A protein has these predicted regions:
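Intrinsically disordered, low-complexity terminal tails
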Residues: 2-19, 28-30, 451-467
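N-terminal amphipathic, basic helical "cap/leader" segment at the start of enzyme domains
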Residues: 2-6, 10, 25-172, 176-177, ...
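Short acidic (Asp/Glu) and glycine-rich catalytic loops that position anionic groups and cofactors
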Residues: 16-18, 32-37, 395-397
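Conserved beta-strand/loop scaffold segments within soluble protein domains that form the structured core
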Residues: 131-133, 137-426, 440-468
Length: 468
């Protein structure tokens, strides 16, 4: 008798199509000063960035790998190429993108999404942006959406220097230092005061090269009273050797501004996803995170929000799916500094076939954060006896004038729920599928429509195998 599985694995057929390697330049594997200097020269960095990279490398060499997360013994930096330049330069015209790269993004739906519902798109292939464009009416509002290299060396150089790796500093942890040394690609966004961008901007990151790392840097500044929704998508084909994604996201939400940052990460199961994301929110500002984590062999992913301003707020909504061979360590952190700040975390995790899902929440309420409110809700669903789900909450409350709550539920599909639905005419397969679908619904409804559809495609709510 076949073992019954209630939820299929992520359907990766479109993501696992590999392009032939046609790189213009691939740096040798490993990490030392000569490699960092070559990357800096290849990118024609200003002097301050050259020095920043080398200082970050020094910090990287001094720091140890974090010992509290899942093991990453299979990741050997001696085998990782930290820079791979595709055989094209960035363009604002889709017709000028090489056919092989264009076909990859066409399969992933990037051009269609842009035509239908996006204000602008950036598409990164390996270490560089190959396409970046923003609608004329959005640019006419003064919105800046460009690649990081252009911002670093062009009109916005001073702004980049002011904000770059000021939220995520190289000495925060070893992989932040690694990012500072070898970063490449990513997007720069600036929304002027009072401007509301009615439709989202999107960046998509595709890592095609085997044995390579991707280190994109996203820097977004939403000025006073402005509003933006930014979407991030990630994928890679599967190889028999390790790949690495150690990106960095820095978000600055000014007074009374609002930023929603939505992510679907669908890395392959040979990927080590060691991404760092952080937001700083000023008076009256709102930061909203929506996160779906479905791929990678190992993930360390804990978006952090600093509620610096009075009456600033944060919401985090996330879902994690851990299948066979996956150890996904995810969560969120919030630091309350301003008065009357509020935060809410609502997460779901699904694990099957021995997959391991861990949710870490950290709530820090400083003495200055009078009348702060925070609520954390995490629910986990294990679909078999081989899987594992852990919840690790940390609360550091330094004032008596705060309202803090935490709720965690870990369980399996109950026979009673299945029996009830079957008594209403559903088959056992449909009953179990409906329960899992409802479990994920709170997150999927927060995603943009096209990403909600993608998430439902990734988690195939179907039964397979025999019954009884």
């Amino acid at each position: 008798m076949k073992e019954r599985t209630y939820v299929d694995d992520v359907d990766r057929s479109v993501y696992d199509i590999k392009d032939e390697e046609n790189d213009a330049y691939r740096i040798k594997s490993g990490l030392d000063a000569s490699i960092v200097e070559k990357i800096s020269k290849e990118k024609n960095d200003p002097v301050w960035m050259q020095n920043f990279r080398l200082q970050s490398l020094q910090i990287y060499n001094e720091l140890k790998v974090p010992n509290w997360g899942p093991p990453i013994d299979g990741l050997n930096m001696d085998n990782i190429a930290t820079y791979v330049r595709p055989n094209t330069r960035m363009t604002a015209k889709w017709s000028e993108v090489p056919e092989d790269i264009k076909n990859t993004f066409e399969r992933l739906g990037i051009p269609q999404a842009e035509r239908k519902s996006l204000a602008g798109v950036g598409a990164q292939y390996d270490s560089e942006l190959v396409y970046h464009n923003v609608r004329e009416e959005v640019a006419a509002q003064g919105v800046v959406y460009t690649d990081m290299e252009s911002a670093l060396k062009g009109e916005y150089a001073d702004m980049v220097k002011k904000y770059f790796m000021k939220l995520v500093r190289p000495n925060d942890h070893k992989f932040a230092a690694l990012h500072g040394a070898v970063w490449s690609g990513g997007s720069f966004v600036y929304v002027p005061p009072g401007v509301s961008v009615e439709i989202p901007l999107q960046s998509y990151f595709r890592l095609n090269a085997p044995g390579a790392g991707q280190f994109a840097h996203t820097l977004i500044i939403v000025d006073e009273g402005a509003d933006l929704h930014f979407i991030e998508g990630c994928s890679a084909p599967k190889y028999n050797i390790a790949n690495l994604h150690a990106g960095c996201v820095e978000l600055f939400v000014k007074k009374n501004a609002r930023l929603r940052y939505s992510t679907i990460e669908n890395w392959s199961k040979n990927m080590y996803n060691l991404n760092t994301k952080r937001a700083l929110v000023e008076d009256g500002g709102t930061m909203e995170w929506v996160s779906g984590s479905f791929g990678s062999h190992v993930s360390y992913l804990y978006p952090m929000t600093i509620l610096k301003g009075d009456r600033s707020r944060m919401e985090f909504t996330g879902i994690t799916f851990a299948g066979k061979g996956q150890n996904l360590d995810t969560g969120a952190k919030v630091v309350h500094i301003g008065k009357e700040t509020s935060s809410f975390m609502n997460t779901r995790s699904i694990s099957k076939d021995g997959g391991i899902s861990t949710f870490r929440s950290s709530v820090v309420v400083n003495k200055s954060a009078e009348n702060a409110k925070s609520a954390v809700s995490c629910q986990s669903l294990m679909l078999d006896s081989k899987s594992r789900s852990d919840t690790i909450p940390v609360m550091d409350i330094r004032t008596p004038h705060a309202d803090i709550g935490h709720e965690a539920k870990i369980g399996r599909i109950s026979d009673e729920a299945v029996f009830y639905l079957m008594s209403r005419g559903l088959s056992e397969e449909d009953a179990r599928a409906m329960i899992v679908s409802g479990f994920a619904d709170n997150v999927s409804k927060e995603l943009p429509l096209e990403y909600a559809v993608e998430m439902n495609n990734l988690i195939q709510l179907e039964m397979k195998g025999s019954i009884g």
